[in-house]
């Protein structure tokens, strides 16, 4: 939407707001006359005629008008906020309460092209932010373009999501969709927790156990590549039909309905609704002796009560309203320098801000993580995290890719964050 469109829209909203105030004011003034006017009462008595009682649900009418005015006020406030925040930017409506902003900033005299999507959750009530896998069948070994992912999820906007293994498409880090944990954390990297209408960020750990009565062992991760031969890993059907190869001295057990249904040192078929546990043989010996009353318990820490979705990234960019780039703590020093970037954050009022930065070209040189962190803070984020970037950086809005990735339309990616209809 250009500046004229915004001006027209805002003046129309202001006029509508004023008209609604006049109507409400008129109702308030008329109510005493309608229900308590003595002249009207005398007239009714003299006429000696039955008067039909018309029930006017004034409270409901008043409340509806107040709701309408409140929504108009919120929309006006959101529009004004975006205009103030991004002077000189190209601003377009994606839908009510959702804006696409396009601008260029200069760092050390060099241009950086930035695309932003802002969502006011109190207005855009028919949409939600959620992670989406590239596969329609929840297969973790999959990659698709962001356009395909967005169309498959009926989404009006999307950005690329968490890191992934380029050869296979398996997400690297915490991924929960609709309360189901698909992959566990790597190096306890920071993640975004998505609740109903609000967001939180935290470093996330896996809290998982393989249980047998009072005996249990720690499960180090779920559906992730092995990092140490001593680790105990759990795999579900989202990983694929079979578990990966066991490490040296390793063993596998397949669990379904709290029972061991198969065991071997070779890769096992993963049962539907069950697990294959891959671990050192000595760790699994006590379970092999029993084979029954065995359970798998997988949670995250923080447990985040009522969380719907989780997606990890890293490092932090903004934490508690302060620039906070913990690149070394999250073992991400390899992604320094000026590069294409993707980030997500939220304001104190839970307005969501998704950002992509083009890079590696003369027209847009990219950002360092510190530059990105300062930008996220400048647009009002109280908390923000970095997502996968570089060649993965891409933003989709209303049917098209709006940034300029190195590969036209963006490379095939493992997962995305989408703004989808509820």
Task: Mark where each language-model region is.
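Zymogen propeptides
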Residues: 8-11, 18-19, 35-275
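Bacterial N-terminal signal peptides
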Residues: 24-33
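Short alpha-helix capping/helix-loop boundary micro-motifs
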Residues: 275-287
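N-terminal Lys/Arg-rich, disordered targeting/topogenic segments
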Residues: 1-13
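Conserved, well-ordered active-site substructure
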Residues: 166-186, 190-194, 310, 317-382, ...
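Short, Lys/Arg- and Gly-enriched loop/turn segments at beta-strand edges
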Residues: 299-311
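Loop/turn positions that initiate beta-strands
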Residues: 288-297
């Amino acid at each position: 939407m250009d500046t004229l469109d915004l001006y027209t829209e805002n003046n129309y909203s202001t006029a509508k707001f004023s008209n609604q105030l006049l109507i409400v004011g008129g109702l308030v003034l008329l109510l005493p006359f309608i229900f308590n006017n003595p002249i009207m009462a005398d007239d009714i008595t003299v006429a000696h005629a039955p008067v039909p009682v018309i029930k006017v649900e004034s409270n409901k009418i008043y409340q509806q008008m107040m709701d309408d005015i409140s929504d108009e006020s919120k929309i006006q406030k959101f529009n004004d906020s975006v205009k103030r925040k991004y002077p000189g930017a190209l601003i377009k409506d994606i839908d009510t309460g959702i804006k696409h902003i396009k601008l260029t900033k200069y760092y050390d005299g060099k241009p950086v092209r930035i695309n932003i999507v802002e969502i006011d959750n109190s207005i855009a009530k028919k949409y939600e932010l959620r992670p989406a896998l590239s596969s329609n069948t929840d297969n973790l070994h999959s990659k698709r373009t962001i356009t395909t992912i967005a169309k498959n999820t009926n989404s009006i906007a999307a950005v690329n999501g968490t890191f992934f293994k380029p050869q296979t498409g398996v997400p690297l880090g915490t991924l929960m969709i609709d309360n189901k944990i698909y992959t566990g954390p790597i190096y306890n990297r920071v993640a975004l927790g998505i609740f109903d209408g609000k967001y939180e960020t935290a470093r996330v750990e896996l809290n998982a156990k393989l249980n047998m009565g009072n005996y249990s062992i720690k499960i180090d991760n779920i559906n992730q590549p092995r990092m140490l031969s001593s680790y105990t890993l759990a795999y579900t059907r989202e990983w694929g039909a079979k578990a990966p190869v066991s490490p040296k001295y390793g063993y596998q057990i397949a669990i379904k309905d709290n029972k061991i249904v198969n065991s071997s040192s070779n890769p096992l078929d993963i049962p539907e609704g069950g697990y294959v546990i891959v671990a050192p043989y000595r760790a699994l010996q006590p379970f092999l002796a029993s084979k029954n009353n065995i359970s798998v318990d997988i949670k995250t820490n923080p447990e985040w009560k009522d969380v719907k979705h989780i997606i990890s990234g890293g490092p932090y960019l903004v934490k508690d309203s302060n620039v906070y780039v913990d690149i070394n703590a999250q073992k991400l020093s390899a992604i320094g320098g000026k590069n294409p970037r993707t980030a997500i954050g939220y304001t104190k009022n839970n307005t969501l801000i998704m950002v992509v930065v083009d890079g590696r070209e003369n027209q847009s040189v990219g950002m360092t993580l510190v530059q990105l962190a300062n930008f996220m803070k400048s647009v009002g984020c109280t908390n923000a995290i970095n997502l996968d970037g570089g060649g993965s950086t891409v933003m989709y809005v209303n049917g098209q890719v709006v940034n300029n990735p190195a590969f036209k339309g963006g490379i095939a990616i493992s997962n995305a964050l989408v703004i989808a209809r509820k």
